[in-house]
């Protein structure tokens, strides 16, 4: 499981190098997060079930600012944890949405000590993630 702060899509090796250089300039102290609301991407055809993390807004803003020269800020984007990818739902969207609305959980807090530049490759068996660079939070 990981927290997505920004989705870049398909980018070249040159762009990856530039992103690495930009993210290396971010200075962040360890910070606390807790689970927020659950939701889906595309209510019409659910593809992703996610949860928002409260407390990640500052680092998301820093990432957006660091990358703004080459990647536009998505106004509607919200940092999130992908809980599930959905391949196919046959007329079950309303049941999933109702379940998520009624979902209850203990709002545990966690400390984030780093952020990672990740590569994801979608395969028929699911996504494959590779850590390209880890950026440590500093006190």
Segments the model singles out, each with a brief description of its role:
Residues 1-139:
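Histidine-dependent nucleotide/RNA phosphoesterase domain, centered on the 2H-phosphoesterase fold
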């Amino acid at each position: 499981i990981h927290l997505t702060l920004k989705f870049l899509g398909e980018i070249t090796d040159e762009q990856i190098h530039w992103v690495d250089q930009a993210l290396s300039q971010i200075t962040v102290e360890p910070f606390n997060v807790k689970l927020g609301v659950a939701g889906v991407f595309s209510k019409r055809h659910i593809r992703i079930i996610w949860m928002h993390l409260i407390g990640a807004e500052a680092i998301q803003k820093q990432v957006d600012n660091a990358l703004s020269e080459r990647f536009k800020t998505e106004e509607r984007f919200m940092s999130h944890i992908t809980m599930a990818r959905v391949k196919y739902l046959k007329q079950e969207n309303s049941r999933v949405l109702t379940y998520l609305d009624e979902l209850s959980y203990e709002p545990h807090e966690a400390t984030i000590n780093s952020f990672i530049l990740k590569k994801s490759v979608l395969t028929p068996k699911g996504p494959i993630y590779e850590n390209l660079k880890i950026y440590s939070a500093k006190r």
